């Protein structure tokens, strides 16, 4: 009887410990490109910031299988969470890909994939933002 109770207790402890464990947050390197899906975030080594790709707020880029007068623009929304708290939201543009300054770092949009096609509409979860954080 005591052995069975001990076994159940050990199993219960193992379940609690495993439930408390969470996968390690991915870490991006300063001055190197990293790719995020909508909703994903990463901490950036050598800084006190976490960058989260909120999503694409609008994509008016000219589809690859269309003829357009203008190239258009896509707006990538990111959230920067310093370790001290208080998130700040920034909109990065594909047409004017200027980095934004957040305290002592710059966040730049390098690329937004996939490129739109008229024949293949892009779903919000399909986007991948390639970003870079520099000093």
Protein language model features and the residues they cover:
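Envelope-exposed proteins and targeting segments
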Residues: 40, 47-49, 72-76, 88, ...
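Positively charged n-region of N-terminal signal peptides that target proteins for export
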Residues: 2-9
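Post-signal peptide N-terminal segment of mature Sec-exported envelope proteins
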Residues: 28-49
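Mature extracytoplasmic domains of secretory-pathway proteins
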Residues: 50-93
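Short, exposed beta-strand-loop hairpins at the edges of beta-sheets
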Residues: 108-126, 130-133
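Short Fe-S-cluster ligation motifs
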Residues: 92-111
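C-terminal motif of bacterial Sec signal peptides marking the signal peptidase cleavage site
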Residues: 17-20
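Bacterial signal peptide processing site
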Residues: 22-25
């Amino acid at each position: 009887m005591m052995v069975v109770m001990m076994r159940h207790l050990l199993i219960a402890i193992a379940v609690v410990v495993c439930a408390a464990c969470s996968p390690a947050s991915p870490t991006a390197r300063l001055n190197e490109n990293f790719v995020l899906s909508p909703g994903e975030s990463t901490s950036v080594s050598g800084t006190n910031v976490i960058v989260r790709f909120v999503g694409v707020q609008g994509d008016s880029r000219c589809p690859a299988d269309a003829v357009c007068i203008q190239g258009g623009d896509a707006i990538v929304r990111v959230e920067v969470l310093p370790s001290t708290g208080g998130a700040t939201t920034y909109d990065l543009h594909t047409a004017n890909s200027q980095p934004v300054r957040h305290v002592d770092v710059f966040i730049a949009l390098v690329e937004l994939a996939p490129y739109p096609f008229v024949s293949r509409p892009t779903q919000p979860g399909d986007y991948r933002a390639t970003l870079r954080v520099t000093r």
